[in-house]
């Protein structure tokens, strides 16, 4: 089955983005509770590259498939989850990278390195880590996993920021998020 990448984020309306989010089909991993655990021998590097046995996974379709099975446990450990087994996966920073952003109609939409779209808001908050000089911004994606905002997307985010009580912040879907650690 051929993969049809979504259109460029800048070409999409908020309605188009909402429709794409509604139509996305992800495996129901929240229903899985396997007892068996095996080592995935996989890791996600800080830059978003996926590796298996030390070799980069160069097929975007494979990365998209694996990422749909990803969950972060309460302990902070990331696992690939199927009905048959749980497979720990080493994540150096965040499971995803946010590589583009669109501000439209009071919402911030992000495209991830997997081509997935995420709307920041109460269900997918942004959080700032690090310090005021070198903040790291993260976006909640799903199942406890996050996306780190890459540098070019961070610059887009800064352009969209306003000062709220003296703190650079952005608002999306009625929720306001500071861009510096609090």
Q: Can you say where each PLM-predicted feature lies in the sequence?
A:
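Long, non-globular segments of proteins
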Residues: 1-182
